[in-house]
Amino acid sequence: MSELISVQALAQCHENEDVLVMDCRFALADPAAGESHYRASHIPGSFYLHLDRDLSGEKGPHGGRHPLPTPEAFTATLSALGVNSEPPTLVVAYDDSGFAFAARLWWLLRYFGHDRVKVLDGGFHAWREAGLPESAAPPKLAGPGNFVARPRPERVVDARQVEAARGQPGVALIDSREAPRFLGLEEPIDPVAGHIQGALNYPWREASRADGTLRSPDEQRGRWGEAAREQDIIVYCGSGVTACVNLLSLAEIGRDDAKLYAGSWSDWCSYPELL
């Protein structure tokens, strides 16, 4: 079953009481931009989730630029918006950045035990292009939900687990950043350029088409090739955000067992002994 929902399908169900839509628009270079765009116009009834405030935890000396939120914090955020674990609410995530931030929410929900989640194919752009209704009105809260975050530790790895796994037979370590960052030719964000030794480069943007929709499963299989057949797949990026697009891509071809190195390169390069 696909992890995506089309704009047409969402238009038919987004007002149902067991469906909640989450606007995840964000810009790393301008953290206020996504929320500003949301206030100007969004899918009617959708709530806004901010990458730094809602989809990440507190930063420390290690753990990367966007650590995972704690179960307690994520429970508080999602339950306050009316998300239920029993019976499970259908959560639909969207953005306008090629799945970069919507996929983060998709992955977090699955990591925290909530599988009833979809990502809007094509994002807000596809919704607007289809001529569907938009709104600037705040959504109505139906009341708190009973969502409880229950982590699935098998879905995530840390730096020491990556160090032990990299280079081992049957392991594909995937770097999701653009090629110039992977090759160490440029590094606009983190203090050290380069990549984890043994990693393969599959830039996250290649998972989608120019119109912002995700490539078909057949296209994804062709893109991944032999890497998707390895026993264990570990995916990272700069801070555990855009790697989730590759995890979404892999889930579409049946590899939803792939793991996220949540701290990613920004965590890895905080350990001098690993460089």
What are these regions (language model features)?
Residues M1-L275:
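Cytosolic catalytic domains that perform sulfur/thiol-centered chemistry
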